[in-house]
Amino acid sequence: MSDKKLDQIRNRIDEIDRQLHELLNDRARQAQAVAEIKKAADPAAVFYRPSREARVLRGVIERNPGPLANETVARLFREIMSACLALESPVRVAYLGPEGTFTQDAVAKHFGGFVESVPLGAIDEVFREVEAAGTHYGVVPVENSLEGMVTHTLDMFTRSSLWICGEVVLPVHQCLMAAGGDPANVRRVYSHGQSLAQCREWLDSHLPQAQRIAVSSNAEAARQASGEKDAAAIAGSAAAEVYGLALLASNIEDDPSNTTRFLVIGREAVPASSSDKTSLLVANPNRPGALHALLEPFARHGVNLTRIESRPSRRSAWDYNFFLDVEGHAEEAPLRDVLEEVRSRAGFFRVLGSYPCPVY
């Protein structure tokens, strides 16, 4: 390719960049105008709208002709919306910390990089922070594809009035990191017990002599390894940035399908977005056939029940609550009609939230 042709292409790229710059700032000004109108009508107005953002991202993907991948385009627009929302009204999000955990990655994936994220030490602390309006939202883990449900998160919904406002599905990719750059010098490997188990085959093959030490979190493992020349940590790549570690190996998990699901919790219900799911908490009367009676309306109306989990209710021995995930929004047919039937048959019934299905 001639130098003249290259110059033409580069000049075109420069022109596109100038147009993008102008359009991004124009979008930001429109977001500020929206904020002014909302604040004038209601000083306590809510600016982050999960259903609105989900519709925007779905539209971006539907219109995408390539060559950029759908997920790449969605991530770009997520950051644009996050930056504009920060101009309207900064959003504070509590999450299960410490800094550098996969939960922090889930915050970034759902809200973008322009929110104020607040790490807390326990799941119940995240719930309390949102309930007390210390933050607008919280993000907590609820299920891992290998380890199962995070029961503490489920149990918190039995005593909290918060709503589920969103869901984040995050592939879990483990990395080996250390203060030094030579894996041959590693004598100890720190990580959470689950992560050590999930990387056992890789460790057996590559670091068979290294001592494996379980700690409270992967972020704590990275912090510990940052102060020891002959130690390494297994954690997500974000932890390496936080604690100044070098990545020695990436994607060392034994099962590449390892995925964690997170819930976004908040104080207000979310309107329909056209592609939603609903989470429920129900308890059935203690009589034969009661559970079948609760589930029968879903099948009769053709509503897909995607998940059912039982947890001890703590009301009495062998008494259980059931957590259900179903397709649809609680305020729209046919699910709305199904829930009225279930409510009339249940010993206890609560909609935990209807929220957009993850876009990417």
Which sequence ranges carry the predicted segments?
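Domain-level signature for soluble enzymes in the chorismate/prephenate branch of the shikimate pathway
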Residues: 1-360
